[in-house]
Curated annotation (Swiss-Prot):
One of its GO terms (cellular component) is extracellular region. It is found in: Secreted. GO terms for biological process: adaptive immune response; blood coagulation; innate immune response. Heterohexamer; disulfide linked. Contains 2 sets of 3 non-identical chains (alpha, beta and gamma). The 2 heterotrimers are in head to head conformation with the N-termini in a small central domain. This is Fibrinogen alpha chain.
Amino acid sequence: TKDEGTFIAEGGGVR
């Protein structure tokens, strides 16, 4: 998921 915070949980996305 490309969201701030979820990049760690989802394994990708915007920091």
